[in-house]
């Protein structure tokens, strides 16, 4: 294992010999540390609690934004409807960017990394008129779409990932941000016969957030956005030679109440997974804050896990794909 000093002074720079990039504070409780270059296959973005210890963004950040952090699975508290609708979102991909970043579900502490396909870094294509992702894209922590459980609404099993979130606020967020969002609705994408829920939400700190309470408010105040969202998800794999994606409910966006049921169900499945009550497959459930989980580790063990990550090369790959535009016929 390498010493911590090289990890901080070498691994965080944009190039060899660069000054260390200090951990970036995220909201009030979380910050991030970069290991390697963002355009390299060994790039990792690790999460730390503001107290200084490493955590998993998948397992250690509470699902509910009003939840007190305890060394246990967070328990719900009675709140009014608006307050009950506040959730934490982990931002993986900022709006207008193309790099397919994601929580590494199979790696200890689940850092964010760029997806790799056929040995190359994966970029989402620009399909005219959209540049990259048209929302801030990320995930709800402490949720899991179980690949062994058939969804009663879609009749398809889950995609083995945390639930995805499309944040529609006006601000472009940063990779690794942890923001409080209001849930507005959901879209059920069927990807290779798997259910892949897309939650529509808005950052509570967005200037327009007070106007949005349910999916119909998106239609009212951001006309065309839901249609663009549906079209984006239908077409984004076409430039790779794949067919258009399909949707449950004929592509209908479901309302907030429906979305909350989807989230609650995925949270219950996550609880079973992190307590080793179901088959988790290759997913890493290593966590720091859930003391009664069989996968719990100490803060010192979490630090050792990060220190044991091989020193990354600072070589970056070409990102030509980000500049290519695709024009598709109707």
From Swiss-Prot:
Catalyzed reactions per annotation: diphosphate + H2O = 2 phosphate + H(+)
Q: Which residues carry this modification: N6-acetyllysine?
A: 219, 256
Q: Which GO terms describe its biological process?
A: diphosphate metabolic process; phosphate-containing compound metabolic process; regulation of mitochondrial membrane potential
Query: Would the keyword Membrane turn up in this protein's UniProt record?
Result: no
PANTHER family annotated for this entry? INORGANIC PYROPHOSPHATASE
Q: Which family does it belong to?
A: Belongs to the PPase family.
Q: What is the name of the protein in this document?
A: Inorganic pyrophosphatase 2, mitochondrial
Species of provenance: Mus musculus (Mouse)
